[in-house]
């Protein structure tokens, strides 16, 4: 049929033609319209018959439907016990799970739906079902602190030693004290010991080590990858299986293999916080600068600050070693022998071997220090023995030796310093006019009288010596420790060198032409002072000795006590 534009054009032309021609054109257009209408009616009847034929045959209707696992989980999430019971009666498995491995029993243990938990367990649900992270329903109930569900799960045989991917058991995750008491009571009732707990924790790693040994024996490639591109070293690194990783590294597996996301084993260890594993991988050449498909380095995947600090230290040490190797390159570095690089030897050593090596070094150092300390103690003991022998000799020596030949005072050197005496004396000594008091080593006071009681020639054999013999002192053996200390203090007082410097201070010059050969001694010695029966003498003309201050009593002082003066 002609279009509308064609009809308008034809009408303009028909106005100019005769009437007969316009009539013929109108009839022609009417015939075309009738033919078009007949065709439309025919098509309409055909569609009606076709629709009636479909209805008579009973065609299926389209509708929305869901998988049984989705429907069961959705009903459990809504706590719809009737619908769950309907699914279970229609032979729907209670162990159906979603893409995360989560079952209806997991979901009900999280939401504390006790009725549906009992319903699922009564229809044979697996009480130890594990999701993708190896969590069991008991893990979920213990973590949430649902003590009623924990009791039900234990009654149906829940595994108290089930270990998830993080190496945690249900009692490790439980923070609710009553729930934890129930779990520990059940563990004690089942006879679970710490040895069993440690054995169960190490079971996954031990199984992996066994599988690796089987692969080695069969000659299989240890760099085998799974559907996600992960190798055995990826798995060991993510789970922290140190022994399995050391076994793989000892057999030369690559540490730079990437999975489909561009992750190396070091990335996995960093993401899951396996610090020792990261140190092991770095020591075997893993790169701390490796990047994933998302342009992430291992340190970017860490969540713990302590782990980040460790990785930064490892990176710094690695950079220092590389710079030192580049700086100290020599002809020896081009050798192919094993002595070419010590860093390679350390890098290929296992963590346990290096720990044993450090322990041996510490033991050797401790032995060396013990030997050095023993030698120092021996030297000190020898030195102390010599000091004791010297002290014993000094104590046994007579502090007042007798002159074999009588010696007068005039025989001593006459050129001596000027003294502070009130009046000079010739060839002798005199006591000062004033009275002096001297503090001795035991706190007593020694008085020197103004007028001497007697005078005698120094060393005159005709006059009885006022000094008692040292043998008499030795015969008076000490009976107590106090007396022994006092005797030692008295002996050291006599042997102190300070006395010899004051001996001639009170002696005046004598005339060279003196006719007297006498050597009178005026107050040459004081009356004896005795601390424990032993006489001790002091020459009064030795000048004014300094006043020595000592602490009393003598028992509280050390043995190193010095007297105020000495007779030479």
Curated annotation (Swiss-Prot):
Subcellular location: Cell membrane; Nucleus; Cell projection
Residue span of region Disordered: 327-346, 373-404, 504-525
Propeptide residue span(s): 566-568
Phosphoserine carried by residues: 69, 333, 337, 350, 477
Lipid attachment in record (S-farnesyl cysteine): 565
Record's comment on post-translational modification: Phosphorylated by PKA and, after PKA priming, by GSK3B. Phosphorylation by GSK3B reduces its association with PP1C and enhances PP1C activity. Dephosphorylation by its associated PP1C results in enhanced association with PP1C, but reduced PP1C activity.
Protein name: Protein phosphatase 1 regulatory inhibitor subunit 16B
Organism: Bos taurus
